[in-house]
Design a protein with these regions (language model features):
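Polytopic transmembrane helical bundles with strong interfacial aromatic enrichment
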Residues: 1-124
Length: 124
């Protein structure tokens, strides 16, 4: 599972850099200030969790069910949270808002909270 966490850490890190540059250089002319701020929030959370997965991938070396749940919750949470924001912002900018993505963002946030909560639990 550590290899998967490290793989996703690298993927999230690389795509966050790409999407951050995309937002800063291309989307800034097409998005409102509010939309750009939302897009940047997605990028920030993605890079934060890339770093967390990278650190945990090297630190949590035991293959326990709890570590697996932590990794999965953080990976699923990052995908649902950040990528739903990207979809909402880009579709909204094209006047074709994809409404079903709206409820996905907080579900992603819940997965992130679960991952952090499980990590906290391992230290208790």
């Amino acid at each position: 599972m550590n290899e998967i966490a490290l793989l996703f850490a690298a993927f999230f890190g690389a795509t966050a850099i790409i999407l951050g540059a995309f937002g800063a250089h291309l989307l800034n002319k097409k998005l409102t200030a509010e939309q750009l701020k939302s897009f940047e929030t997605g990028v920030k959370y993605q890079i934060y969790h890339a770093i967390v997965l990278l650190i945990l991938g090297f630190q949590l070396t035991e293959s326990t069910p709890m570590n697996k749940y932590i990794f999965l919750a953080l990976i699923i949470g990052t995908v649902l949270f950040s990528f739903s924001i990207y979809g909402l912002v880009i579709s909204s900018a094209r006047n074709k808002k994809i409404r079903f993505l709206g409820p996905i963002t907080p579900i992603g946030g819940v997965f992130l909270l679960i991952g952090w909560g499980l990590l906290l639990y391992t230290f208790m």
